[in-house]
């Protein structure tokens, strides 16, 4: 079968020149103007670090609470003066006690011996108190030592240091029944994991993940109590005192949960570190960022002003709990997600959370 003849004349073959310059008319103008002369610019070039670049780290939460770290202990003139006057006061009390006992002996021997017995009981009580406070400070120091050793062990190529860290962590949390299953898992897999980062991550998931869930429950309960008391209290001073009470109680519970069990002096040190962290990060006051977190969820149109203040104080208590969690936790957050302030908004305002909208 042949094609039917066509009436159109055939076009002879031809060659066409393809020029890129013809397709870009703007280039001709630039060529006519000539090249730009070299220039110098006085503005400084600011490079954004990779960890702060939102395009490199799209999952980074810009409103996340900064990680709290213990303050470095420095010797100051105030501490030296306080120690000097403390020694003078102790010497004065000693001289007064000596003169008192001598006067009692001069009056009657049994009064002098009774005073000596009371003095011995007081000295023993003070020694017991000093031992208890020293033990609490040592436990807090042990928590920070384990955290520092874990960070150093992750950079090692051999698992010896990582296994030593896991062993110390297991000993620290041995008295906590929440870690019994994790300790059994670590003992069953002993010697199987040889990579230090994976070994530290396994210990964090098995030992600290159950404690993290309990710590989150402590923060939520304390924040709810603060919110309720703030909403119903008639005076602002009552709010302030109750927030302080709940904060101290929450910090102590957090330290005991992670094996710290601080004494009175250790508790003051923890409280000072938490308050210093919040003051540095601007979280101790009700700032614009905290208000935006609440108002951004529609609370301005759905809650009263007093109840809104309760939610804000509850979120401030949650910030204190997160800071205490950072300070008291024996390992830094790596294998387990660190809680943020946004994780507690749904608990304080269930009507604003997705599950609260479901029938």
Swiss-Prot record:
User: What is the recorded name of this protein?
Assistant: UPF0283 membrane protein RHE_CH02332
Q: What GO terms fall under cellular component here?
A: plasma membrane
| Pfam families listed in its UniProt record | DUF697
Q: Which compartments does it reside in? A: Cell inner membrane
Q: Which keywords are on file for this protein?
A: Cell inner membrane, Cell membrane, Membrane, Transmembrane, Transmembrane helix
Instruction: Region Disordered: list its residue ranges.
Output: 1-61
Q: What is its main location?
A: membrane
According to Swiss-Prot or TrEMBL, what is its membrane topology?
Multi-pass membrane protein
Sequence similarity: Belongs to the UPF0283 family.
Transmembrane region(s): 77-97, 111-131
């Amino acid at each position: 079968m042949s094609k039917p003849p066509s009436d159109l004349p055939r076009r002879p073959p031809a060659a066409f020149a393809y020029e890129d310059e013809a397709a870009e008319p703007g280039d001709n103008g630039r060529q006519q103007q000539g090249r730009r002369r070299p220039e110098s610019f006085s503005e400084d070039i600011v490079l954004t670090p990779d960890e702060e670049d939102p395009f490199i780290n799209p999952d980074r939460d810009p409103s996340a609470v900064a990680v709290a770290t213990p303050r470095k202990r420095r010797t100051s003139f105030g501490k030296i003066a306080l120690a000097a006057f403390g020694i003078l006061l102790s010497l004065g009390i000693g001289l007064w006690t000596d003169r008192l006992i001598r006067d009692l002996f001069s009056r009657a021997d049994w009064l002098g011996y009774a005073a000596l017995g009371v003095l011995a009981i007081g000295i023993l009580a003070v020694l017991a108190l000093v031992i208890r406070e020293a033990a609490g400070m040592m436990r807090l120091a042990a928590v920070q030592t384990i955290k520092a050793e874990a960070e150093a062990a992750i950079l090692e190529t051999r698992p010896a240091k990582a296994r030593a860290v896991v062993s110390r962590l297991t000993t620290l949390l041995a008295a906590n029944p929440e870690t019994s299953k994790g300790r059994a898992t670590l003992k069953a897999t002993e010697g199987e994991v040889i990579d230090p980062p994976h070994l530290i991550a396994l210990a964090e998931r098995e030992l600290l993940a159950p404690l993290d869930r309990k710590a989150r429950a402590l923060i939520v309960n304390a924040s709810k109590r603060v919110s309720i008391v703030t909403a119903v209290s008639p005076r602002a001073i009552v709010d302030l005192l109750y927030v302080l009470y709940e904060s101290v109680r929450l910090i102590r519970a957090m330290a005991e949960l992670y094996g710290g069990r601080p004494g009175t002096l250790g508790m003051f040190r923890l409280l000072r570190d938490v308050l210093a962290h919040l003051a540095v990060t601007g979280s101790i006051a009700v700032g614009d960022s905290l208000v935006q977190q609440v108002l951004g969820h529609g609370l301005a149109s759905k809650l009263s002003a007093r109840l809104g203040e309760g939610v804000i104080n509850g979120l401030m208590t949650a910030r204190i709990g997160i800071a205490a969690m950072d300070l008291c936790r024996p390992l830094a957050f790596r294998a387990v997600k660190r809680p943020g302030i946004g994780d507690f908004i749904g608990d304080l305002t269930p009507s604003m959370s997705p599950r609260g909208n479901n029938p």
